[in-house]
Amino acid sequence: MSPFMKLIFSLPALLVLASCSGTDNTTKTDTVSNANNGKTKSAQVLRIAAAANLAGILPTVIEAYQAKAAYNKDGQNIDRQDTDNSKLKIEVTYASSGKLFAQINSGAPYDLFLSADQAFPAKYVQQQANTRSTAQPPFTYARGQLALYSSNKDLSPIKTLDKTSLQQLFSTQPNANSNTVKITLANPDLAPYGASAKAFLQQQEGFNELSDSKRLIQAENIGQAFQYAHTATTDYGFVALSQLISAKVKPSKYLVLQPESYPAILQDGIVISDHPKATDFSQYLQSESAQSLFVDAGYLPITNP
């Protein structure tokens, strides 16, 4: 994520290029309560370490959470003293999951870790196995959607992406040799969206051909992949649907892949402190109310446990 970006909820345009950035820069934004004169007890501050791709949706989720009474799985209000979330100050640090994980291991005082994948929360549990017998298990709070995007082509005539339609798209370029058609995807070794895009192309028997002909441009992360496609540096790009929705891209410019055609892009979180609101907020993330916000932002819903 670009270091110039200090996230403020009114900057949605910049959030697109920063989402899933995978960089080592850390950006912090606060959602501050109306507590009297700003005097907030430590128990009224919830510190969240969040993957950069959540910068466009998490502020909305936090606002909704603070606007309602404390949530529990049974849909019942808990102790009245603990139900006013508007008095809770929530501090969010956005960065790559890897950097956040390193900060947590170095003792950073986070209460909740929201990763861009399932690997880091699982690794945290493994590390804590011998020291914290009461550690909570990871939970899945979001499932990303993959899309093929072209900023200068009309993709509306194509109803579904398969081997035949991909060959037509990637080999047809007016007034140019077919080998000049470039496609970008995020680094499959580092980015969940890139790994899923690679798996999709392999399933359609197109990955090796594109790679061997040097037409497959590997971006550092999903944010850079979006930038390449958005600026027409490449003809096509495998990007996150949430990026397209955030950027208000016309639907005719992209195709959403069928969810069953690539490995699920699941994002897990884990409570890493005894803060009561950390558990409460983690449960809210999995609620129908929060999931509807994720769906509006371009994610697939997660079944409420």
Predicted segments — roles?
Residues 13-14:
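Residue-level signal for mature regions of secreted extracellular proteins and peptides
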Residues 1-9:
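Bacterial N-terminal signal peptides that target proteins for export
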Residues 130-132:
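Short helix C-cap/helix-to-loop transition motifs enriched in small/turn-promoting residues
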Residues 20-89, 93-94, 98, 105, ...:
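Exported/periplasmic ABC-transporter solute-binding proteins
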